[in-house]
């Protein structure tokens, strides 16, 4: 994972041999840590959980927050293709679901 991507993605239990990557988008006001227990639960099933860490949350408190979902999507769209050819999916809760949906649409364009 590149330096730019590593700020955005928190991987609590890296699995280089995982069969699937699940990108998890937190609800508004939350950070990547809300999905850390998922990483342990999915590990036995060959799934690597990558939690999205937005600016101005948890370990990124000094980073300026982004003002819109479009800005978040624009920042993330180029970071997902990092040489990882395994299948992946998105999960988002509340605002995170909207970000995940808009990111999926942006990747199709």
Predicted regions: what they are:
Residues 1-109:
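Domain-scale detector for complete catalytic domains at protein termini or as standalone homologs
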């Amino acid at each position: 994972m590149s330096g730019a991507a590593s700020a955005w993605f928190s991987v609590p239990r890296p699995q280089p041999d995982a069969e699937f990557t699940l990108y998890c988008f937190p609800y508004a006001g939350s950070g990547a840590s809300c999905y850390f227990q998922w990483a342990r639960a999915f590990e036995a099933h060959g799934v690597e959980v990558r939690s999205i860490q937005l600016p101005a949350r948890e370990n990124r408190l000094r980073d300026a927050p982004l003002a819109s979902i479009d800005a978040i999507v624009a920042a993330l769209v180029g970071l997902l293709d990092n040489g990882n050819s395994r299948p992946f999916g998105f999960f988002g809760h509340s605002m995170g679901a909207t970000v995940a949906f808009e990111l999926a649409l942006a990747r199709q364009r």
